[in-house]
Design a protein with these regions (language model features):
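Bacterial Sec-dependent N-terminal signal peptides
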Residues: 1-28
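Terminal domain-start segments
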Residues: 23-96
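Surface-exposed loop/turn elements that mediate protein-protein interactions on large endomembrane-trafficking
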Residues: 70-80, 121-133, 186, 190
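Short consensus segments that form the blades of beta-propeller domains
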Residues: 81-82, 108-115, 168-176
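Short, surface-exposed coil-to-beta transition loops
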Residues: 86-90, 104-106, 114-119, 140-143, ...
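Structural signature of eukaryotic scaffold interfaces centered on beta-propeller domains
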Residues: 90-98, 144-151
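Mid-length scaffold segments of soluble, non-membrane domains
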Residues: 98-133
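Short aromatic loop motif centered on NTY/YTY
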Residues: 130-197
């Protein structure tokens, strides 16, 4: 009887019972990520990236657009995915004041070599969270590049007020863009990013 109880106790984590007792790594969550978060990567593509890392290969896969996407870095709490030459995503695990972990996803596209980023937050079950609960955007609504320091969780937002380069005859010279940089730090106590002074 003791032997049977011992076998059941060992098998419970495999069945998902007690699985919440250990924190999931970003690698695990990347594999479970819904395709809506990164539509060009199928479940197979994500599995191939993680398998390539385990086998010390380039973490690259042919995505659904039949071009290559490459994971530049994948750790237990940070990931940097280059989707195409004009698109990338960064993932960072953050801890709130109650110990709950959330995932921040920074999506960046290049528009005429000017980066434009958006930030989204998710639970570890990949349920979308309200961004304004964790981060307030700078007041300028033009192009922004958002980066995160994977070690300190410091968020840097560079906003560029760049003019459009559209003109009928090509005679309008674009003026130099105005650039503003704001730096935020993650506050576990407040469970949100706070603008550095």
């Amino acid at each position: 009887m003791k032997f049977i109880l011992h076998i059941i106790a060992l098998a419970l984590p495999l069945w998902g019972v007690g699985g919440s007792l250990h924190a999931q790594s970003l690698k695990d969550l990347f594999l479970k990520m819904p395709q809506e978060v990164c539509p060009v990567l199928s479940e197979y593509n994500r599995l191939e990236i993680v398998d390539n890392q385990k086998n010390d290969k380039t973490m690259q896969t042919r995505n659904l657009f039949r071009t290559f996407s490459e994971m530049k870095e994948l750790t237990d709490d940070y990931a940097h995915l280059v989707i195409s030459k004009n698109s990338e995503k960064e993932f960072k695990m953050l801890t709130k004041n109650d110990g709950t972990r959330i995932i921040m996803v920074i999506s960046t596209i290049l528009c005429d070599d000017i980066p434009d980023s958006s930030v989204a937050f998710y639970s570890t079950e990949w349920k979308p969270l309200r961004t304004l609960d964790y981060y307030t955007l700078p007041p300028i609504d033009n192009f922004r590049k958002v980066t995160i320091d994977k070690a300190t969780s410091q968020l840097t937002v560079t906003t560029t007020n760049a003019p459009l380069k559209l003109s009928i005859e090509g005679s309008n010279q674009p003026k130099e863009p105005f650039t503003l940089t704001n730096t935020f730090r993650w506050s576990t106590e407040e469970s949100r990013f706070i603008l550095n002074d």
